[in-house]
Regions:
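Short, well-structured beta-strand-loop connectors
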Residues: 48-58, 95-111
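Hydrophobic alpha-helical targeting segments used for export or membrane insertion
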Residues: 2-13
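Acidic, glycine-rich catalytic/binding loops that coordinate metals and/or anionic ligands
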Residues: 13, 42, 97-103, 112-113, ...
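Short glycine/threonine/proline-enriched tight-turn/helix- or strand-capping micro-motif at secondary-structure
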Residues: 20-52
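Short, solvent-exposed loop/turn positions at domain surfaces
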Residues: 43-45, 90-96
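Zn2+-dependent peptidoglycan hydrolase active-site motif and core
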Residues: 51-92, 113-118
Length: 169
């Protein structure tokens, strides 16, 4: 008997801004209990905010005086149709509208202070479940390799981008 296994990988999320995480995700004890359902980045006002993933914008608008952009990831990213990724706390660029496709790293607006990043898993017939996006953020790491001694100087190892999670696979 031959067994085949398929390893599905997901594309890492690009941090929407280039600052460290200021506030971590805090899992609420119940569906409607208090908790921090986003990770937040402290960012100077007016700095560019980038799309964390390629996909179709399903919402671009203001909620309680803050701009939010929700992206349904493209099929090639590995996330599937049940995942939505939202960036909040920004002033949205005029060309960022619902139904438009964005590329990873494309500017979607400018910071209005604290930038929020959230992930939701939506299953048919069930409430949306928030997921900690931290494990999906891309991290730079050097590739380890052995270099034989040849008397010449060593070459630098390439830097790879990795994320430790795969979404439910």
């Amino acid at each position: 008997m031959i067994v085949f296994s398929l390893l599905l990988t997901v594309q890492c999320l690009l941090a929407p801004v280039q600052t460290p995480v200021a506030f971590q995700y805090v899992e609420p004890p119940c569906e409607y209990c208090a908790g921090r359902r986003t990770i937040d980045f402290a960012q100077s006002v007016g700095q560019s905010v980038l799309a964390p993933i390629a996909g179709r914008i399903t919402f671009a608008g203001t909620v309680v005086d803050q701009g939010y952009v929700t992206i349904d990831p493209s099929p090639g990213t590995g996330y599937g149709p049940e995942v939505l990724i939202t960036v909040g706390g920004l002033v949205i660029d005029a060309n960022i509208v619902s139904g438009r496709n964005v590329q990873v790293g494309e500017r979607i607006g400018v910071s209005n202070g604290l930038i929020h990043l959230s992930m939701r898993s939506i299953r048919e017939g069930k409430s949306a479940r928030y997921v900690d996006p931290t494990a999906y953020l891309g991290r730079r790491r050097p590739r380890v390799r052995l270099i034989p001694y040849s008397g010449f100087g060593a070459r630098r190892a390439q830097i790879g981008l990795t994320c430790p999670a795969s979404f439910g696979r």
